[in-house]
UniProtKB/Swiss-Prot annotation:
Known function: Joins adenosylcobinamide-GDP and alpha-ribazole to generate adenosylcobalamin (Ado-cobalamin). Also synthesizes adenosylcobalamin 5'-phosphate from adenosylcobinamide-GDP and alpha-ribazole 5'-phosphate.
Top-rank taxon, per record: Bacteria
Assigned EC number: 2.7.8.26
Protein family: Belongs to the CobS family.
Identification of the protein by name: Adenosylcobinamide-GDP ribazoletransferase
NCBIfam families: cobS (TIGR00317), PRK00235.1-5 (NF001278)
Enzyme class: transferase
Signal peptide (residue range): none
Catalytic activity: alpha-ribazole + adenosylcob(III)inamide-GDP = adenosylcob(III)alamin + GMP + H(+); alpha-ribazole 5'-phosphate + adenosylcob(III)inamide-GDP = adenosylcob(III)alamin 5'-phosphate + GMP + H(+)
Reported cofactor(s): Mg(2+)
A GO molecular-function descriptor: cobalamin 5'-phosphate synthase activity
GO cellular component annotations of the record: plasma membrane
GO terms under biological process: cobalamin biosynthetic process
Length: 240
């Protein structure tokens, strides 16, 4: 179960202690458990939503979104901010884009992107709360983290060294394919058209990454996760 605990420590703000520095092979295997971490997040959000029944819808949605952000420690929002700054500031140049992405400072494009994404997610949750949200809360966190597995399975990692390279090089590819198949079938059962929307957004974002960078980075993977979560909740709110 060590790979699961590695995944949970990396993807969440939950207090997880590991017995020393994990080997690269275990780090790679941890990717297989990313969807399980997403499912855990979804279950916690579902439980929170159940406990918040009777709360005014705007407050209910705001508290759900706050819990959502706290569970991940805003890790992927940071990747989204860095990617937004780099994508517009890079002017189509690969090296400039990668250089800006490493800058820890956030520019106005990053701030605007974060505000818009969180605002849209809040509004979508507000709609879903009004409709009596249930098991659908499992979908977005699960799809977002399964997408990271799919991204590392089929996309080159362009930054040498670090966690991302270990994930890409030591991922058990056949097992990853089976995990993704199970995730897709489960999500199609729960979400229908919103899952197909997420698949389309995934394909589009991956195309943009490969065209600009020749692959992915940790920041663009985080941005992908955030935008797919948004696509799913928007699709559900729109009745897809």
């Amino acid at each position: 179960m060590l790979p699961f605990w590695i995944a949970l420590q990396f993807l969440s703000s939950l207090p997880v202690s590991l017995p020393g520095m994990p080997a690269p092979r275990e780090v790679g295997r941890s990717l297989l458990y990313y969807p399980l971490v997403g499912l855990l997040f979804g279950l916690l959000l579902w439980l929170a939503s159940h406990l918040l029944q009777g709360t005014p819808s705007p407050l209910h949605a705001a508290l759900l979104l706050t819990l959502w952000v706290l569970l991940s420690g805003a890790l992927h929002l940071d990747g989204l901010a860095d990617s937004a700054d780099a994508w517009l500031g890079g002017f189509g140049d690969r090296e400039r884009t990668l250089r800006i992405m490493k800058d820890p400072r956030s520019g106005p494009i990053a701030v605007v992107t974060l505000v818009l994404v969180l605002l849209l997610k809040f509004c979508a949750l507000w709609v879903l709360v009004g409709q009596g949200i249930g098991a659908q809360l499992l979908l977005a966190p699960l799809i977002g983290r399964a997408a990271m597995l799919g991204l590392f399975l089929g996309t080159p990692y362009v930054r040498p060294g670090g966690l991302g390279q270990a994930l890409a090089e030591h991922l058990p590819r056949r097992a990853a394919g089976w995990v993704l198949l199970v995730c897709v079938l489960f999500c199609l059962f729960l979400g229908g058209w919103s899952v197909l929307l997420a698949l389309a957004v995934f394909a589009w974002l991956r195309h943009l990454m490969c065209r600009r960078l020749g692959g992915t980075t940790g920041d663009t993977a985080g941005a992908l996760l955030e935008l797919l979560e948004l696509a799913v909740v928007l699709g559900l709110a729109l009745g897809l």
